Amino acid sequence: MRISKEDIINAHDRIKPYIHRTPVMTNQSINEMTGINFYFKCENFQKIGAFKIRGGMNATLTLSADQLKNGIATHSSGNHAQALAFAAKN
């Protein structure tokens, strides 16, 4: 499956109302110790505390009404399960 730039833009537009825009941060001490500029995308500030909400919301929002009648299920006890539970609730 090839993912296009348009696919990414469409996914972004779909999930935007349901997620936080999380910050990108850096740490001067780490940068100085390593000689490299590190940047951290802080998805721990996301609504469920993980980036998995992005995929869970996108997958759920692309289902048809017919598919949604069957419900949503996953085999996970972690962040993916939290993401799908959040998506199903919303």
Name each model feature, range by range.
Residues 1-90:
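PLP-dependent amino-acid enzyme catalytic core
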